[in-house]
Amino acid sequence: MTVNNPPIEILQAEVDAWIKTTGVRYFDPLTNMAMLSEEVGEVARIMARRYGQQSEKESDKAKDLGEELSDVLFVVLCLANQTGTDLQSAWQKAMDKKNSRDADRHHDNPKLR
């Protein structure tokens, strides 16, 4: 890992430090869950208008998908910190499961050709 590509545990620590200094404290988990839904909605709006069939409004054109995805990640990291979830370990377990369970699953899928 490089400084430009930190492991998830470093991102979790960075969010925790920001919350405890600039943010004062974490919002309660249910508030963060609502905020996560809001941020995902902002991503959905961009996707529907920029990559889907909805027309993109002039006011939507300046919105940055990467910034909105980062907002989603920030709230996910907050929720992980609040619940004591080690996302680095959870990520590795999820990838191990996908690599073993889905190793050949998608190769014969005609929808992906």
Pin down the residues of each PLM region.
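Flexible "arm" and connector segments at domain edges
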Residues: 1-69, 73-113
